[in-house]
A protein has these predicted regions:
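C-terminal catalytic histidine-bearing segment of alpha/beta-hydrolase fold enzymes
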Residues: 376-440
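Mobile cap/lid helix-loop segments that gate and shape the active-site cleft of serine hydrolases
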Residues: 295-346, 367, 371-392
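Conserved strand-to-loop "acid loop" that flanks and positions the catalytic carboxylate
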Residues: 351-366, 410
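Bacterial N-terminal signal peptides
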Residues: 10-21
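Primarily recognizes the serine-hydrolase "nucleophile elbow" in alpha/beta-hydrolase
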Residues: 252-312, 316, 335-336
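N-terminal targeting or regulatory segments adjacent to alpha/beta-hydrolase or S9 domains
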Residues: 24-130, 138-139, 158-163, 440
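Cap/lid segment of the alpha/beta-hydrolase catalytic domain
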Residues: 148-252, 256-259, 299, 305-307
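Bacterial N-terminal signal peptides that target proteins for export
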Residues: 2-11
Length: 445
């Protein structure tokens, strides 16, 4: 066998292996998921008595009693303590590109130092994040879609060469050549970069960063970074997990975006795929500023109910990714039904803001049914806020009603044209925005 064929075969084997482990998935189960809703309702009922707190009777009961209790419980049992909010400093800012053609106005790179309560193992003692910000042509302030990238901003900006736009080592699958091409082929056209031009045409700005700049996504490496972000006095079993650290990073990025007069601080939208979908939901649960959230295939400890027998068990995810969570979460590996909180309660903490949950029909490991029932389980809190009831009955396309929505497109774990089509339609419907700059700004397959 020639060297070229050996290289391609090796790349195929590498990426096939990645397909079996992407997004926190230990396996990819291939049968199609039924579009008919199955499984029991989310438990415990979101307004029922919880621990020593009596049943919720009013919106003030939820806001004053239940929401703080749930936030404390999610930190102690699943995600770990949220890091303290200190501030940020923009170290540098410069324009990468100002295209003459198309709807994109400016693409900028910002180097941002995040201030932390304690110095850590980062170079200079504090995390430094490279932020790419695209603003469209036209008159602002613009709504901005903000989310992390798996492979850093070099993958987001394929035309840019030279200085790496991330301070941490990237996994090998993020390299160029055949492996990088196959990652995109398997995980979707937009696995590395969102549809820039389409977002600009629709009037949205885009903000992207690499969460691994704050906590690297490697269990053996992450611990000292997590220790530095964990608030002093936190119990060891409640040590900050990487999901919480990445959620905190999202909020710090919103600090930066909210101070930019070209952007509308009332229309900052968070999104994330897989582990970053978990972080987007958690960030918005603790931060009231995201106007809407899109979580794509966020799975266990994301949108999927933890008590389901379908999907990724706590035992598997905490064994494969122990750094993502508080150490206490692993104690439920053999008894996950004993955990008294579940993900419908996390989604309820986002009320009354719009939430879109996306899944793939062959991503059974991500538990589409459990994610749908989690939305249904959060709905009573949304109704407390006066929002329209969640009326969707099938795991297909959103019914166009209310601010809770779910879709299931064909395929596996990845980011595809259908995902961005659903997300932009949802944002257009639920978050007021300016008239699009140009007509016919739909996505091309």
């Amino acid at each position: 066998m020639g060297l070229g064929r050996k290289f391609v075969l090796g790349a195929v084997l590498v990426v096939t292996g990645l397909a079996l482990s992407a997004g926190g998935c230990a396996l990819q189960r291939l049968p199609n998921v039924s579009a008919e809703v199955t499984g029991p309702p989310a438990s415990p009922p979101v307004l029922a008595a919880f621990q020593s707190d009596p049943a919720i009777q009013s919106l003030s009961d939820w806001q004053d009693r239940r929401a703080p209790l749930l936030k404390a419980r999610f930190q102690s049992e699943i995600y770990g303590a949220m890091p303290a909010t200190v501030g940020y400093e923009i170290i540098s800012r410069y324009v990468l590109e100002k295209p003459e053609k198309g709807a994109i106005g400016t693409i900028e790179r910002l180097t941002i130092a995040l201030k932390t309560a304690e110095a850590g193992p980062w170079t200079g003692g504090r995390p430094v994040v490279d932020l790419i910000l695209m603003t469209p042509k036209g008159k602002g302030p613009f709504p901005v879609i903000a989310g992390g990238t798996f492979c850093g901003n070099d993958a987001l900006l394929p035309k840019q060469t030279g200085t790496r736009t991330t301070t941490m080592a990237l996994p090998p699958e993020c390299g160029g050549g055949a492996p990088g091409f196959l990652v995109t082929a398997i995980f979707g056209k937009y696995a590395n970069a969102p549809p820039w031009e389409t977002l600009a045409q629709r009037g949205y700005a885009l903000a992207s960063w690499h969460p691994g700049d704050v906590v690297p996504d490697v269990a053996e490496v992450a611990e000292p970074y997590l220790a530095a972000l964990t608030p002093i006095g936190t119990l060891p079993e409640q040590r900050t997990g990487a999901i919480a650290a990445w959620a905190w990073t999202s909020s710090r990025i919103l600090d930066v975006l909210g101070d930019d007069p070209r952007l509308d601080a009332r229309r900052m939208l968070l999104w994330g795929h897989s582990r970053h979908g978990k972080a987007a939901l958690l960030s918005a649960a603790f931060d009231p500023r995201p106007a809407a959230v899109w979580a794509l295939q966020s799975g266990t400890a994301g949108a999927a109910l933890g008590r389901d027998d379908v999907g990724e068990p706590v035992a598997d995810i905490t064994r494969a990714f122990p750094h993502w969570f508080a150490p206490s979460y692993a104690s439920y590996a053999a008894k996950q039904a004993d955990l008294d909180i579940d993900q419908h309660q996390l989604i309820a903490l986002l009320a009354p803001r719009p939430v879109l949950i996306g899944t793939g029909r062959r991503d059974q490991w991500g538990d589409p049914h459990g994610s749908f029932r989690a939305l249904k389980g959060a709905d009573p809190v949304y109704q407390l806020f006066g929002q329209q009831a969640f009326t969707q009955t099938k795991l297909r396309h959103p019914d166009g009603k209310g601010v809770l929505a779910f879709y299931m497109r064909p395929g596996l774990h990845g980011i595809h044209t259908e995902d961005w089509t659903e997300a932009l339609s949802f944002f257009d419907r639920t978050v007021p925005k300016a008239v699009p700059n140009t007509p016919n700004s739909g996505l091309k397959p």
